[in-house]
Amino acid sequence: ALYIIAIVAIGFGGLFAWFSYITPLMTEVSKFEPSKIPSIMILAGFGMLIGNFLGGWMADKMRPALASAILFGIFVVVLILVFSFSENKMASLALTFVCGILSMSVGSPINIIMIRAAKKSEMLAAAFMQAAFNIANSVGAYLGGIPLIKGYGYQYPSLVGAFLAFGGLLLCVVFMLKFKPFTQKVENEDVL
């Protein structure tokens, strides 16, 4: 269970490194008017909504650990694209939507892994997962802010996010190799 918490705390830090600085990224780098930020946040939120469904669908169709690794891998690439193309308004909007999708799609498969690993402690596992997401929030926001303190632009937190998501990907791969019983495809089953 601690290994899964580490995957979440590090891998989801990539989301928060990007999302914590989305407003200055959009206004300072992409050059959107501040009045457009609520609409951009709705776009990201709509992507997150779709991501929840995508993650659940993927967890049903393949092994949850594999789904998590694939999604973290794609998230790494997309965060690098955010870093590279944030000066283009249309690319920035499209990547915000895709980041929204990817950021939430990993949640379902990784939660399934945790619940399966918990064995009769599912409620406690769910609480630990929430704590891991909170750790990811603080780690991502903190590490994403370091380049800003050093004088780099607002696209750099996305690069930090890519490294964190890559850490989540590596941990998923190691998890799949080390804990094979928890990485098998899930048949629909009652959890609680």
Residue spans for each PLM region:
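C-terminal transmembrane helical hairpin of 12-TM major facilitator-type secondary transporters
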Residues: 65-110
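Intracellular helix-loop hinge segments at the cytoplasmic ends of transmembrane helices
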Residues: 24, 107-117
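Extracytoplasmic gate region of multi-pass secondary transporters
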Residues: 1-42, 46
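Helix-to-loop junctions at the C-terminal end of transmembrane segments
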Residues: 51-64, 148-149
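Small-residue hotspots at the loop-to-helix junctions and early N-terminal turns
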Residues: 34-42, 123-127, 158
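Multi-pass alpha-helical transporter architecture, strongest
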Residues: 162-192
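A late C-terminal transmembrane helix in Major Facilitator Superfamily
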Residues: 116-154, 161
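Residue-level signature of mid-helix packing/kink "hotspots" within the transmembrane helices
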Residues: 45-53, 137-138
